[in-house]
Amino acid sequence: MSEKIQAIRGMHDILPDMTPRWQQVEHQIRSVMANYGYREIRLPIVEKTELFKRSIGEVTDIVEKEMYVFEDRNGDSLTLRPEGTAGCLRACLEHGLLHNQTHRLWYAGPMFRHERPQKGRYRQFHQVGVEVFGMPGPDIDAELIFLSRRLWQRLGVAHKLRLELNSLGTPDERLAYRQILVDYLRENYDALDADSARRLETNPLRILDSKNPAMKDLLAGAPVLADHLGGASRAHFEGLTELLDAAEIPYVINPRLVRGLDYYCNTVFEWVTDELGTQGTVCAGGRYDGLVAQLGGRDSSAIGFALGMERLIELTGETFAENAPHIYFITVGTAAERRGAVLAEMLRDAFPSLRLVVNCGGGSFKNQFKRADKSAAAFALVLGEDEMRDDSISLKPLRSDDAQQTVAQADLVRLIQSCVPI
């Protein structure tokens, strides 16, 4: 026997017993996006490597260590997308969507990063992204938070998540603060761990986000970015917090929240939980006003967020039940199988939401009832030799002690209507 081929490490299968939970979460996402007037955009999984180098930054961990990069037959360097913002913006610029226009967009799909797999972190993972272009004020920042909070409420997880905020200011303000932070960290170089020492030369603001407990005291004494913001940046952030206060949305201002991508400015935010171990960030985003020009467009304001589907679905737990069949249709004998196929299609016409599984492959009554029970269906619809002879059909409850009912086949629709909650 040949050796079985396994899935690539860090790339997981979503099996049929889990897909109902995914589908139900996806349904709520689509519903909330429609509530707020956001339109879906569908994007390629593969983009030119240069897109991510220019947008994410060449000295970030993602570009340096985590991207799946390959050459096609023409020698072009291509990359499996590690995030969605750059591809969404590329599509908007390529198709002229941003010319004197505002847009509220969303997308969903797999992303790829060559990280060390662990609980809640995969090399292929799924994100839902939201991007807004052409709206510079704090009101749209607040709308994204309102939208995400409404999704948590729909999914029954709002009580498990808390909102953390910060402002990174303008690129110039952040650059000036960067030097102040670097000076402080160099004075305390011996206290840096190996990862922070490396980041000191490449992306020092990411040191503020260190999860190493040994760095806690050092970072507690570090200069705070908020103390180095200009008046316009302060006013923008205050405008956001005032809107959140008015909507009675609780939040924590976290001066160490910096985000992992170079293109962020002004507002940044995360929805975090304590219920998923170290992988506590479920949703994160912020402003990236300079990225449009960086990728060849005109200067334009932009803001967005991404949420991790795997983490969100784990957080929902058993909030959503599996979509088990309403009915398992048992047919015994060739004539019953033929008649059953016709009746099944009639029921699907009459009840578009009906989940009906028809037994295929034959089998005795006993074996078919075992399959019906294993399917978790609520009812068994039975069509055997006796029913064929009498032109009748029987409905047997499988999850209660209610009595089996037998009616004429002509009355089947009325029977289903009265007995099966669809």
Curated annotation (Swiss-Prot):
Its EC number is 6.1.1.21. GO terms for cellular component: cytoplasm. CDD domains: HisRS-like_core, HisRS_anticodon. It is an enzyme of class 6 (ligase). Keywords: Aminoacyl-tRNA synthetase, ATP-binding, Cytoplasm, Ligase, Nucleotide-binding, Protein biosynthesis. Pfam families: HGTP_anticodon, tRNA-synt_His. One of its GO terms (biological process) is histidyl-tRNA aminoacylation. Coiled coil: none annotated. It is found in: Cytoplasm. Gene3D superfamilies: Anticodon-binding domain, Bira Bifunctional Protein, Domain 2. InterPro entries: aa-tRNA-synth_II (IPR006195), aa-tRNA-synth_II/BPL/LPL (IPR045864), Anticodon-bd (IPR004154), Anticodon-bd_dom_sf (IPR036621), His-tRNA-ligase (IPR015807), HisRS-like_core (IPR041715), HisRS/HisZ (IPR004516), HisRS_anticodon (IPR033656). PROSITE patterns: AA_TRNA_LIGASE_II. The keyword Calcium does not apply. It comes from the Bacteria. GO terms for molecular function: ATP binding; histidine-tRNA ligase activity. The keyword Protein biosynthesis applies. It catalyses: tRNA(His) + L-histidine + ATP = L-histidyl-tRNA(His) + AMP + diphosphate + H(+). Homodimer. Belongs to the class-II aminoacyl-tRNA synthetase family. This is Histidine--tRNA ligase. It comes from Methylococcus capsulatus (strain ATCC 33009 / NCIMB 11132 / Bath). The gene is hisS.
